[in-house]
Amino acid sequence: MSFAAGEGGWIAIAGLGPGDDALVTPEVDAALAAATDVVGYIPYVARVAPRAGLALHPSDNRVELDRAAHALELAAQGRRVVVVSSGDPGVFAMASALFEALEVGPAHWRDIDIRVLPGITAMLAAAARAGAPLGHDFCAINLSDNLKPWSLIEKRLRLAAEADFAMAFYNPRSASRPEGFVRTLALLRELCGDARPILFARAVTTAQETLHIVPLGQARADMADMRTMVIVGSSRTRIIERARGPILYTPRGISDEVAG
């Protein structure tokens, strides 16, 4: 799809990837080059280079619906707006928030050209750095209880462990709610045992990147923060030890005997 000027207002909800600018897609770069406005959370807008003719609209966390409404109104006025998210905009990010605002907003917003531009989400970047821990069935769970109760998070953790999924956790731990990840680790040790491998991948693809693979029995809540992607293997996930560093992977197949 073209992002040329002179076509009226539009919105591109764009994923900036996990951190390395080399992982931003050409489609997202083209949208940013054509944009008149960039809207997003402060650290994500900071990743966009300023230039003449481009207005930057950074905003604080937890104002996603206000941010979405602002972007929609700008586009309704004929502006070319890029709403930026880290990773992929459709994975625990701004695409859903914008469509929530669109659904309840003024009727004229529905005439706006809206496009979602995918990016590399942190889950996939972290998995690639470690090997292939998501090589078989897996699930992604947001551990933040800002938009859902802990009881629902616990239910999903239990069911995922029972089904023997590998599990990828977004937003595992913050300063305001450190107890949630403590409870998560305790529950996983109860359900999966102490030997299950767990990956802590922090600030993946940036200069601050760190990777740690430990057994669940040695995992501590303070190994994670809001910049950390946590991946827990399934019962089939393996570690290949080598001098260049371990490889964490999950085999592609499961026999009928094992599955039964």
Where are these regions (language model features)?
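Class I S-adenosyl-L-methionine
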Residues: 1-117, 255-260
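A contiguous loop/helix-start segment that scaffolds small-molecule binding in enzyme catalytic cores
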Residues: 2-3, 11-13, 80, 162-260
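Class I SAM-dependent methyltransferase SAM-binding "motif I" and its flanking Rossmann-like core
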Residues: 3, 91-163
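Generic secondary-structure signature for well-ordered alpha-helical cores
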Residues: 37, 73-77, 103, 128, ...
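Short, active-site-adjacent cap segments at secondary-structure transitions
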Residues: 45-47, 90-92, 123, 205-208, ...
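A short acidic, often aromatic-flanked loop/helix-cap motif at beta-alpha or helix-coil junctions
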Residues: 62-67, 122, 146-148, 205-208
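Short amphipathic alpha-helix with an adjacent loop that forms part of the alpha/beta core around
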Residues: 69-74, 155-158, 218-221
